[in-house]
Amino acid sequence: MPVFTHLDDDRARMVDVSAKGEVYRKAVATGTITLRPDTLSAIRDGTVVKGNVLATARVAATLAIKDTPRLIPMCHAIPVHGIDITFDYTKTGITATVTVISAGKTGVEMEALVGVSTALLTIWDMVKSAEKDEKGQYPVTGISDIRVLEKVKQDL
């Protein structure tokens, strides 16, 4: 049976990491948003009414990464030393990849996942008017495959 460090007698608690040493931490997470072809073209061409979609998604992801401990209750507040956010167009959407770097007592996987999720949600928000069908539904739009691609932990 797996051991869950954030549960104590079925009560949620924040794990004490004070005795751990600081080490280099890196996490890379990715996820994809599926969009209509016309929407992808509008993003590429810079004609989305709300503005520069990917620049806005990059800023939103950066802010979310810094706010991760406020969003994920048992996540420790750790120093974030570096963030890299990239976007790649696919045939049917956009893939966001977020890298977070720290030197701390705990990993940065949650920060990377929150960053990817927020980037993709921001893209959706900025293009939702173009993605809706005549009934106000989103038959094409979807967010998928959010996952951690890489986790690094090395002594300093």
Curated annotation (Swiss-Prot):
Gene3D superfamilies xref list: Molybdopterin cofactor biosynthesis C (MoaC) domain
Pathway the protein contributes to: Cofactor biosynthesis; molybdopterin biosynthesis
Pfam families to which the protein is assigned, alphabetical: MoaC (PF01967)
Disulphide bonds in the chain: none
Binding positions (substrate): M74, C75, H76, M110, E111
Domain of life (superkingdom): Archaea
This enzyme's EC code(s): 4.6.1.17
UniProt keyword annotations, A-Z: Lyase, Molybdenum cofactor biosynthesis
Gene Ontology terms: biological process: Mo-molybdopterin cofactor biosynthetic process
Residues annotated as the enzyme's active site: D125
GO terms, molecular function: cyclic pyranopterin monophosphate synthase activity
Function per UniProt: Catalyzes the conversion of (8S)-3',8-cyclo-7,8-dihydroguanosine 5'-triphosphate to cyclic pyranopterin monophosphate (cPMP).
Self-association and partners: Homohexamer; trimer of dimers.
Family: Belongs to the MoaC family.
Entries under HAMAP family matching the protein: MoaC_A
Protein name stated in the entry: Probable cyclic pyranopterin monophosphate synthase
